[in-house]
Amino acid sequence: MTQQSNPNEQTVELNRTILYWGLLLIFVLAVLFSNYFFN
């Protein structure tokens, strides 16, 4: 049971980190594009 739950928890943490990095990247790109258009 523990051998199956540990990889699942790791994949969930990996997916969460990828999701957070993706949102951060989108936010940074949105700020850069907004600055480019306003300037």
Swiss-Prot record:
Annotated compartments: Plastid membrane
Chief location category = plastid
Give the UniProt record's GO annotations in the biological process aspect.
photosynthesis
What function does this protein fulfil?
One of the components of the core complex of photosystem II (PSII). PSII is a light-driven water:plastoquinone oxidoreductase that uses light energy to abstract electrons from H(2)O, generating O(2) and a proton gradient subsequently used for ATP formation. It consists of a core antenna complex that captures photons, and an electron transfer chain that converts photonic excitation into a charge separation. This subunit is found at the monomer-monomer interface and is required for correct PSII assembly and/or dimerization.
* Topological relation to the membrane, as annotated: Single-pass membrane protein
Recorded hits in InterPro entries, A to Z, give:
PSII_PsbL, PSII_PsbL_sf
What Gene Ontology cellular-component terms does the record carry? photosystem II reaction center; plastid membrane; thylakoid membrane
The UniProt entry's sequence similarity note says: Belongs to the PsbL family.
The record's listing under Pfam families reads:
PsbL (PF02419)
**Segments passing through the bilayer:** 18-38
Under which name does UniProt file this protein? Photosystem II reaction center protein L
> What quaternary arrangement does the UniProt entry report?
PSII is composed of 1 copy each of membrane proteins PsbA, PsbB, PsbC, PsbD, PsbE, PsbF, PsbH, PsbI, PsbJ, PsbK, PsbL, PsbM, PsbT, PsbX, PsbY, PsbZ, Psb30/Ycf12, at least 3 peripheral proteins of the oxygen-evolving complex and a large number of cofactors. It forms dimeric complexes.
What UniProt keywords apply to this chain's record, in alphabetical order? Membrane, Photosynthesis, Photosystem II, Plastid, Reaction center, Transmembrane, Transmembrane helix
Indicate yes or no for the key word Transcription regulation.
no
